[in-house]
Regions:
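Juxtadomain coupling helices with adjacent low-complexity linkers
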Residues: 27-33
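C-terminal coupling/interaction segments
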Residues: 24, 37-38
C-alpha cells in the first residue's frame, strides 16, 4: 500500500485523514459479519482465542463512545487520536467488544450495541451483571468453566483441565493467554473466584 505523503505528514490534511480512514476500513472489514458468508464466520467456541484486554480498558472505550461527541457511533481514527492509542492496540480492543456483542466494527467505524449502551450507562453492579450475561452467551470458555463449577458438588475445578483442553486447539502460549483472559473477565463479572497459587476455580465469595 503506497503512502504518497512526504515526512513530516500533516495529520489534519483532509487527503491524509481520508487515507487513514480507508486503511482502518480495510483492516476492520474482516470483522464485519456477512449474512451471505455465515459459514466463514462461525460462532465462538471454547477454542476461540481471547485477547489480553482488560475490563478497565473496555469500560473506558465504551464510556468514551457513549458520550458526546460520538453518542454511540465513531470513526476509528478519531477515537484512536482522542484516546492517544495506536491502531494495533485499538483494533483488538474493538474486536473484544464485538466478541461480547457490546460493539460492532463496520467499515472503519465502531458502533455501540444496545448492550454496550446499557453497560456504559450503568452503575458498577449493572455493568457486572451485563458483562456476566455477555460472557455466558458469547464466550464459551467462561460459560463452560461456570457450568462445571455449578455441576460439581464442591464447586471447584482445576485450571489444568481447561488449559489442557485449550492446548488441543492452540499453542501452549495462546492457551495460557486465553485462560488468563477468561479468568480476568470471569472474576470481574463475579462468575467465579480463582486461587492463583492453587490454580483452582471455585464459587467461593460469589453471591
Amino acid at each position: 500500500l503506497a503512502v504518497p505523503f512526504a515526512h513530516p505528514r500533516d495529520r489534519l490534511d483532509p487527503a491524509f485523514r481520508q487515507m487513514v480512514d480507508d486503511i482502518y476500513a480495510l483492516m476492520t472489514r474482516r470483522a464485519v459479519p456477512d449474512p451471505k458468508a455465515h459459514a466463514a464466520h462461525p460462532a465462538p467456541t471454547i477454542a476461540t482465542p481471547l485477547p489480553p484486554i482488560g475490563t478497565n480498558l473496555m469500560s473506558g472505550l465504551l464510556e468514551t463512545l457513549a458520550a458526546p461527541p460520538y453518542n454511540g457511533h465513531a470513526d476509528l481514527p478519531a477515537v484512536a487520536s482522542a484516546l492517544q492509542m495506536e491502531l494495533d492496540d485499538l483494533l483488538p480492543l474493538g474486536e473484544a467488544l464485538q466478541l461480547l456483542h457490546l460493539a460492532v466494527l463496520e467499515e472503519g467505524d465502531i458502533r455501540l450495541t444496545e448492550a454496550g449502551r446499557t453497560f456504559a450507562d450503568g452503575d458498577t453492579d449493572t455493568r457486572k451483571e451485563q458483562f456476566a450475561q455477555a460472557l455466558r452467551a458469547h464466550v464459551p470458555l467462561v460459560a463452560q468453566i461456570r457450568q462445571v463449577l455449578d455441576e460439581r458438588w464442591n464447586h471447584r475445578a482445576s485450571a489444568v483441565r481447561f488449559r489442557d483442553e485449550l492446548e488441543d486447539h492452540m499453542s501452549p502460549e495462546y492457551a495460557a493467554q486465553t485462560l488468563r483472559t477468561a479468568i480476568s473477565w470471569g472474576r470481574y463479572a463475579e462468575l467465579f473466584s480463582y486461587d492463583e497459587e492453587a490454580e483452582q476455580f471455585s464459587l467461593e465469595d460469589i453471591e
